Amino acid sequence: MADRKRRPLTTRNSARLKTKRQREELARNPVFEPKSKYRSIHPIRVGLSTSSVYPMTVRECFETASRLGYDGVEVMITNNEETQDAGLMARFAEATGLPVLSVHAPTLLLMPRVMTKDHWEKLRLTAELAKEAGARTVVLHPPFRWQGEYALGFVDGVRQVAQETGVRLAVENMYPWRAGLREIQVYYPDWNPLDEDYDDLTFDFSHASTAGMNALETVGEIFDKLRHVHLTDGAGSLKDEHLVPGEGTMPVAETLQYLAKYNWQGDVVVEVNTRFVRKQSSREKMLADSIAFAREHLGLDEDVPRRYSHSHTRTSEHKPARSERDDES
C-alpha cells in the first residue's frame, strides 16, 4: 500500500461560509426545472431506514414502510438482536412484500463492540448478513483516525471484503467535527470520499450540510460510483440534523431531479430524525411527506414518461452549475 500523507488534526472551520455561498449561488443560478419531469430508465427504489423510526422495532419499521407505500427497508445494525437476525428480516420482508434494500454496518462511534470488536470481521459479518437477508448493499462510515491498521488499510480492505462476499460496500460521506473556530479531522483517510479510490459510495444530504458540501457538485463528481442515497436535509447547523427533505436549505429536490434526468441507478433511503416526536401520527406524517418528496422529484409520483437523456459523463455539459471553489486557506 502506498504511503499516505497524514492530514492535520485540525483545520479552519469553513462549513457555514461554504453553505452560505452555495445558497447564494443557487439563488442566482437556479438549476431546478419546476415544469420538467424526469424518470430514470433504471428503477429507483425508495426505502425507509430503521433509524427513521427509532426506537420502534424492525418489525414496526417494515409495517410502517408497507403502510406508507415505501419500496423496501434499510436495517441499521445495533445492539438490538433483531437487527442482527437475517432470518427474522427475511420473514418480515415476506410478510410485508418489502425487500431489505440495504444494511447499515455498526461503524458509528458508539458501536465499537457491536457484533465484534474486530473491525474487519465486523464488515465481513455485516456483508454476509446483508447477503443472507437479500440486500445487495452495505452502507458504512469511514474509520476514525485512531483505529490503527483498520484506518490505514481501509480503502483496499473495503474492496477486498466486497470482492470476497459479492456485496457492495458503499462508503458514506461524513463531516468534520467542530470545536470553536476549528474543524477536527477525526475520520481517516477523510470524511469526504471524493479523493479516495472507493468503488461504491453513499451520499447523505444531512452529512453534506454539516460539512458545508455542495450537494449538486458532489453528486456530479461521484455519479459513476454512487450506489445509494440517504434522503434527508440540513440547514447548515454544526449538528447532524437529518431533517425531513425540503425542510432544510440543501438542494435536495434539484439533486434528485438531476439523478433522474441522467438515468442514475440505485436506491434512495429516507433517513430522517423522528426521535423527538411523541405522537405516532406526527412521525407517520414526516415519513409520508418524505416519500412523497422523493417520488415527486424522482418522477415516480405519476405516469411520467421516461426521458432518455444522454448518458451521464463527466463534462461541464452534464454537470450542475457550481460555485467557485472556496479558498481553504
Where are these regions (language model features)?
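Histidine-acidic metal/acid-base catalytic patches
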Residues: 4-7, 12-47, 54-66, 94, ...
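Active-site beta-loop-alpha junctions enriched in small/polar residues
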Residues: 49-53, 76-80, 105-108, 143-145, ...
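Soluble or luminal CAZymes and related metallo-dependent hydrolases
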Residues: 57, 85, 118, 122, ...
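Structural motif corresponding to the early beta-alpha repeats
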Residues: 71, 75-152, 265, 274-277
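Alpha-helix-loop-beta-strand connector modules within alpha/beta enzyme cores
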Residues: 90-106, 156-166, 191-196, 252-255
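Short, structured loop/turn "capping" segments at alpha-beta junctions
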Residues: 165-171, 199-203
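Conserved anion-binding
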Residues: 168-182
